[in-house]
Amino acid sequence: MADITDIKSIIYTEKSLGLQEEGYVVIQTSEKMTKNQLKAVLKEYFGVTPVKINSLRMKGKTKRFRGVEGKRDNYKKFYVKLPEGASIESLAV
């Protein structure tokens, strides 16, 4: 079962702030989290049942540091449509 610790952060970009006006929140999670698990976590910890959830798998970027090549972790990005009047205030993990 997924836990709130699988949620890495809420993403704040120009696109996500524009979607916020339409009632969406963009959440970055670990790669293993599913839509149903995210729905359960949001319901348990924030008391919000999402109307709609869309997900994307994002590949981690390749980075170089002092000549050594490494890779950031892959992650999932969820676009969560919240009911009218509902919000997720903070995500202090």
Swiss-Prot record:
Single GO molecular function: structural constituent of ribosome
Pfam families membership: Ribosomal_L23
Biological process per Gene Ontology, one example term: translation
InterPro entries assigned to the protein according to its UniProt record, in alphabetical order: Nucleotide-bd_a/b_plait_sf, Ribosomal_uL23-like, Ribosomal_uL23/eL15/eS24_sf
Gene3D superfamilies on file: 3.30.70.330
Annotated organism of origin: Nitratiruptor sp. (strain SB155-2)
Gene coding for it: rplW
Complexes and interactors: Part of the 50S ribosomal subunit. Contacts protein L29, and trigger factor when it is bound to the ribosome.
Family listed: Belongs to the universal ribosomal protein uL23 family.
Coiled coil spans: none
Keyword Amino-acid biosynthesis among UniProt keywords: no
Keywords, alphabetical: Ribonucleoprotein, Ribosomal protein, RNA-binding, rRNA-binding
Protein name from the UniProt record: Large ribosomal subunit protein uL23
